[in-house]
Design a protein with these regions (language model features):
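Glycine-rich active-site/cofactor-binding loop and its immediate structural neighborhood
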Residues: 1-19
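A SIS-like phosphosugar-recognition module
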Residues: 8-9, 20-21, 27-349
């Protein structure tokens, strides 16, 4: 959201710490003034290890700058479904922003998890984002099947996966503002649909979702489009562009859109090639907060509809939880020299 809607005249700079990676931490805080920094600690359960260690590192950074006690409370807030989160961070209750326990992280941008975006982009922009998402919700509820955009995308994806045997999907936006959207889509679809057990508890035979990848369309023409065009693999593709530019450089935009439309034609399967591509094009009039909200909600609804078609629960992630458990055991087996009984010998090397 922030990458798509930020401007060159932004008043607040927003930075994200997600991985437990000290290099990332140093690069971000190295350019910050602790006395002008607000830290938003966001975690649904408040048990995610990466969030905890980053919060502790930030806390230490503030302390080393002489920020503690009541001053610290002016520099840190918590967003969580865990009512004890603020207390656990030694912060007052007014620094706590609650979210619902029943909303998964990948569906939570519309909640207080979006606080950072609201602060950086402004409340009016964030409200427009919500309004756009709500408009898509209304469309899903009211539009007939033949005109229901998320349903059409879901049915196309389901057909590509189960009938045509296409196991991967490539997202190619021809717009710098949507460059990182593929990372969000990866989590949204693959964490929601990557299950081998159905909602009824039975093992699923056949595919459940596709591998999601992609990149900036124009740049990717010079890297993996050769493979898409003439390789022997099969790929479904969403190719997206905005008709109106978000800048004043008309010549650049004309070239960009020409490339997008040309590639939409070029990537379609030809008789002389062995590959099979199923290409869908999405054209947006212009990218603003409302349209971005609608676009994100479009893919959210597509994903949940695919869950219904595949017969799986798109709102849990048991594989992720298992990995967290093993990570914790390995971390503490090393620190306390326990044997790490659930881990194989390679993990303990």
């Amino acid at each position: 959201v922030y990458q798509a809607l930020r401007t060159t005249r932004e008043q607040v700079r927003l930075h994200f710490l997600a991985a437990a990676d000290g290099v990332s931490f140093d690069r971000i805080v190295g350019d910050l003034n602790p006395f002008k920094t607000l830290v938003i600690v966001s975690s649904k359960s408040f048990t995610t290890r990466e969030t905890a260690v980053n919060a502790a590192a930030i806390d230490q950074w503030l302390l080393e700058a002489g920020i503690s006690g009541e001053d610290r409370a002016r520099h840190m807030v918590v967003v969580s479904a865990n009512k004890n989160a603020a207390r656990d961070m030694n912060l007052p209750e007014e620094n706590f922003f609650p979210i619902w326990k029943w909303v998964g992280g990948r569906f939570s941008v519309w909640s207080a998890i979006g606080l950072a975006d609201a602060v950086a982009l402004g409340s009016d922009t964030f409200r427009a984002l919500l309004d756009g998402a709500h408009a898509m919700d209304e469309h899903v509820a009211q539009a007939p099947a033949g005109e229901n955009l998320p349903l059409l995308l879901a049915l196309i994806s389901y057909w590509n996966s189960t009938r045509l045997g296409i196991e991967q999907h490539c997202f190619l936006p021809y717009d710098e503002r949507l460059r990182t959207m593929v990372m969000w889509l990866q989590q949204l679809e693959m964490e929601s649909l990557g299950k081998h057990v159905g909602a009824d508890g039975a093992l699923i035979e056949g595919p459940t979702g596709q591998a999601i990848w992609g990149g900036h369309g124009n740049e990717s023409q010079h890297s993996f489009y050769q493979w898409l065009r003439e390789g022997t693999g099969s790929t479904s593709i969403d190719l997206l562009w905005c008709e109106k530019p978000g800048h004043r450089h008309a010549d650049l935009h004309r070239v960009l859109i020409a490339n997008a439309k040309a590639q939409a034609e070029a990537l379609i399967t030809r008789e002389e090639t062995e590959c099979f591509n199923a290409v869908s094009t999405i054209s947006i009039d212009q990218l603003d907060a409302a349209r971005l909200g609608a676009l994100m909600a479009l893919y959210e609804h597509k994903t949940t509809m695919l869950g219904t078609l595949y017969g799986i629960n798109p709102f849990d992630q048991p594989g992720v939880e298992f990995g967290k458990k093993l990570s914790r055991e390995l971390e503490f087996s090393r620190s306390s020299r326990r044997d790490g009984s659930a881990l194989d010998s390679n993990s303990l090397n």
